[in-house]
Amino acid sequence: MPQTVCVLGGGVAGLSAAQELAERGFHVHIYERKPVMGGKARSIPVPGSALPDHKPLPGEHGFRFFPGFYKHVIDTMRRIPYGAHGNAFDNLAVATRILLARAGQTEITWVARCPSSLEDLRVFLMELFTPLGVPPEELAYFVSRLLIVATSCPERRLMEFEKIAWWDFIAAPRMSKAYQVYLGEGLTRSLVAMRAEESSTRTVGITQLQLLYGLISPDRVFDRLLTGPTSDVWIDPWTQYLRSLGVEFHPGTRVAGIEVDGARVTGITVNDGPRIEADFYIAALPVEVMASLVTDSLKRAAPSIANLDKLQTRWMNGIQFYLAHDVPVVNGHAIYLDSPWALTSISQRQFWTNFDFSQFGNGSVKGILSVDISEWQQPGVIYGKPAQECTAEELEAEVWAQLKQHLNEGGATTLNDADLLSWFLDPDIEFPNPSAATNAEPLLINTAGSFQYRPEAQIELENLFLASDYVRTYTDIACMEAANEAARRAVNCVLVASNSTAPPALLWPLEEPAFLKPLQELDRIRFGLGLPHHLASR
């Protein structure tokens, strides 16, 4: 008789764990508080937007993108059937450009190059960032700091860079305003949704480099985007596949407590439902939810999760604009560097090649501009209020105005008010009172020194394992890839604990250019001797 695994949470982590387990013969139950699966990745039908014979307009928590360094999620998608003979991976399109838009200034487009040495990489990075208008000597310093991270050994990254805020590592306080705005704040907020002033140099530096390596690796794409609404081309086929494997779904189930006896979980209590029992449990819950379930008894049984409440979250949520005319903007991401709210966007129709837009809403929408807001605590350009203090209508007006400041320059009118038919704000942004918003699904951020509070997938309990983006992973940043990797790690713990003979779920370390390896080995020797990085004094 197959052993039973209870997966708490039906987002990317929970679905990933369920797939790996079900493919290995386990009987899996997924419990999810929302009425649908997919977590932050799910599509959200816009209420009241459709004619009787049409589909609702597709909304979302935020647009999905799959950088070139994603391997775990990609492997999972290749195993999800789609259509007659394809799989979900077939629903990814390669984005060929990334646009850096500035208010009232010429836009910058990044394209790929192929450096093969450290000097090539330095020249490439200098050329990449030069159009931002940062003083040359400051730009050279910033590039040198990136190269230090690139050529550092893992030990230095963890034991030294983990404790330093990126803002301090790149010496932003003593640099020009352009340096601070574009290289310090803009790239950090937009590329990794983190604040340079508080975020770990290890996480920010490595993630920025991984994204940039997508521009320099001939065998890696910079980015991929879905060819349709996320639920249509990924989440729904995924849940259908899991059902075919025998996975049972329990939507609308909110976890109330985790019961322990010694080193074992004995059951899960839920609101408005019977107590849950299983052979093994995987907690695939966001950090703020899991932290709320960690009681004193659970802390005593599993000390490694006692400090989850010390991990911090910030807001990163989306708004979609539905347009009467399509505005492609760029074949990929647009980053709005002068936006006080750290906006990024994707114009989706150019990638949704197999979807008939006339079947959405009332048939009048010709384009969708999906925008992520990564900074919620800085004043906007219209009302002078932070996003957190705005009403939904003020949020829409502010984001639209900030987009126009960046795109409508040089006499061009890329965005026209008359083309804006409607908009949709992530419903996780809630408005309990008119003067302040709340966020039901914030995003984990890796503040300097926070690694010590993050547990492994394997904790002290014999039958409870963790699968969420706060778990220690190679990926090391809150995203779908980290969630999927953590799920694989949790599944491997189940395999060991159950004495299964099934092969373990595959794991991939982050890839770095081969020409960096000798320099990293040199730094390992220097670090072991207590010496600084060899580039630090230059």
Model regions: which residues?
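Active-site-proximal substrate-binding core of FAD-dependent oxidoreductases
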Residues: 493-538
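Active-site/ligand-binding neighborhood in enzyme catalytic cores
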Residues: 142-257, 261
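Short hydrophobic core segments
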Residues: 8, 255, 276-290
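Conserved beta-strand-loop-beta-strand element in the redox core of flavoprotein oxidoreductases
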Residues: 257-276
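N-terminal Rossmann-like FAD-binding beta1-loop-alpha1 element of flavoenzymes
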Residues: 3-30
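Dinucleotide-binding Rossmann-like beta1-alpha1 core, especially the glycine-rich loop
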Residues: 51-142
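C-terminal segments that line or cap access tunnels to active or ligand-binding sites in enzymes
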Residues: 216-226, 278-280, 288-454, 458-485, ...
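Glycine-rich FAD pyrophosphate-binding loop
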Residues: 22-49
